[in-house]
Amino acid sequence: MNNNGMQMPQARYVLPSFIEQSAYGTKETNPYAKLFEERIIFLGTQVDDTSANDIMAQLLVLEGLDPDRDITMYINSPGGSFTSLMAIYDTMQYVRPDVRTVCLGQAASAAAVLLAAGAPGKRACLPNSRVLIHQPATQGTQGQVSDLEIQAKEIERMRTLMEQTLARHTGRSAEQVRIDTDRDKILTAEEAVEYGIVDQVFDYRKLNG
């Protein structure tokens, strides 16, 4: 966790910290804290309750600091919980700043919906990004017949909501999204633009230097 109690994306190496000097003295910081100072949120883990709470808190804090400046969310995530996805999604739509979304690596399942939910014209992929969309995953269900019926209705509700959400942000019909997500649909960066999940593929900064 960082100094604010937020969980940082897990790394297979030691996360470096460094000393930063300013007119007010010195302080120890780390890459994720520096990104936050630049109004950048990094989703680099599975979408679950913990990561959702962290991201929602950062969105709300950044809105309070400056409601008129964009927030950028970088995404490299295999997806995860549908309820956690919708919690982040609602917060992205709720806050006043535009939320830019950028995929680097992959945006799969729930993370693909978050990628598409960025502000119109402000959604992008890096060239070798991978985007995967499919219907919400469900765990094995058990219980009484009446409970199974309730669970089946909830599964269908979640699927319909996800389809409507993707349709809203891609310009596709909900019916087309249902067909496309019946099985895994894997998109390259260029295909994600064609589908309407993002608006552009970023060039490497070195090429523009």
UniProtKB/Swiss-Prot annotation:
Gene Ontology MF: a single term: serine-type endopeptidase activity
EC number(s) on file: 3.4.21.92
Keywords tagged on the record: Cytoplasm, Hydrolase, Protease, Serine protease
One Pfam family linked to the record: CLP_protease
GO biological process: protein quality control for misfolded or incompletely synthesized proteins
Catalytic activity, as annotated: Hydrolysis of proteins to small peptides in the presence of ATP and magnesium. alpha-casein is the usual test substrate. In the absence of ATP, only oligopeptides shorter than five residues are hydrolyzed (such as succinyl-Leu-Tyr-|-NHMec, and Leu-Tyr-Leu-|-Tyr-Trp, in which cleavage of the -Tyr-|-Leu- and -Tyr-|-Trp bonds also occurs)
Entry annotated with the keyword Cell cycle: no
InterPro entries associated with the record: ClpP, ClpP/crotonase-like_dom_sf, ClpP/TepA, ClpP_His_AS, ClpP_Ser_AS
Active site (record annotation): S109 (nucleophile), H134
Keyword Protease among UniProt keywords: yes
Location within or outside the cell: Cytoplasm
Entry's Gene Ontology cellular component terms: cytoplasm; endopeptidase Clp complex
Domain of life: Bacteria
Subunit (UniProt): Fourteen ClpP subunits assemble into 2 heptameric rings which stack back to back to give a disk-like structure with a central cavity, resembling the structure of eukaryotic proteasomes.
Main function: Cleaves peptides in various proteins in a process that requires ATP hydrolysis. Has a chymotrypsin-like activity. Plays a major role in the degradation of misfolded proteins.
Family: Belongs to the peptidase S14 family.
PANTHER family attached to this UniProt entry: ATP-DEPENDENT CLP PROTEASE PROTEOLYTIC SUBUNIT, ATP-DEPENDENT CLP PROTEASE PROTEOLYTIC SUBUNIT-LIKE-RELATED
Annotated NCBIfam families: PRK00277.1, PRK12553.1
Protein name per its UniProtKB record: ATP-dependent Clp protease proteolytic subunit 1
